[in-house]
Amino acid sequence: MFTLKIENAAGAVIELTHDRKNYGIISVQGLTRPPAQINTATAGTVDGAFYNSARLEMRNIVITVVPFGDIEGNRQRLYDIFPLPHTPCTVYFENKNRSVKIQGYVETLEGDLFQNRETIQVSIICPRPYWQDLTTIYTELSQTLARFEFPFSITEPIPISEYTEYPAATVINSGDVISGLVIHGSVTGAVSGLMIYNSTSGQYIGFDYAFQSGDEITVNTLSGSLSARLLRQGQIINLMQYLASGSKWLKLALGENNFTFAADGAEDITITLETVNLYGGV
């Protein structure tokens, strides 16, 4: 069993499964991993070729649906949910193991209106080919660890927070794709020489910049969205020019990824790692 929903840019949602009164799903194509383009090169008399690189093509989801009941009304409702290609729609898919979504643009919506059983076929092109998990995971890195939770009952004193000289956290990439992440930094005092490390890969990203109380840092390492910005008193400052030498756009390998950070004034900054698992197919 599976659930298929579509959301348009206005936030309207339609479920095409489990609604036999109005719609019947004939088929859904493009749910598994899209084809890859393999780039190779040949050399002299060497048999075969040498691998250079590879990339996944765009995902093409094709939904074939039969409108029931008020056939004309339900067909016209599809026009509203599947917008013209100038605005995106979001496809939600859920099965036993995964609840995911992907954004795309409607390429075609066509059908034969004069068949005894009218069938509508919708083709959606997804420029970014990976399915995204519906759950966003937030992992905190701080020298001060919160220990106070509700509800509680105590008979002897307990710590409500704890200081650690070497903040560390583990992020688990449970998807099947190496992915980026969004790094948030909230500054409450003078902080400089900020370095954020992925101990698993041995890579880091850092900034030669003096941060001050109230600063909000956002570093995006997602493919196609690379950026490093600072929000200070309503003004956005591009931090790209302040990247420390040797900095890399940190990625999440499959499985465990161990993170830590260091800075002068490290007690005055909290780092939050925002991650979403990505999948090649459902």
Model-predicted regions and their roles:
Residues 46-69, 116-129, 257:
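Oligomerization/assembly interface segments of phage tail-like spikes and tubes
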Residues 1-58, 99-110:
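Solvent-exposed edge beta-strands and adjacent loop segments
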Residues 132-140:
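Short, charged, solvent-exposed linker or helix-capping segments at domain edges/interfaces
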Residues 55-89, 97-98:
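Compositionally biased, low-complexity regions
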Residues 62-66, 92, 123-125, 182-186, ...:
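Residue-level recognition of well-ordered beta-strand positions that form the cores
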Residues 139-282:
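Intrinsically disordered, low-complexity segments enriched in serine, threonine, and glycine
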Residues 90-133:
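Short beta-strand and beta-hairpin "edge-sheet" elements
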Residues 43, 56-60, 99, 117-119, ...:
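A general secondary-structure signal for short beta-strands and their flanking turns/coil
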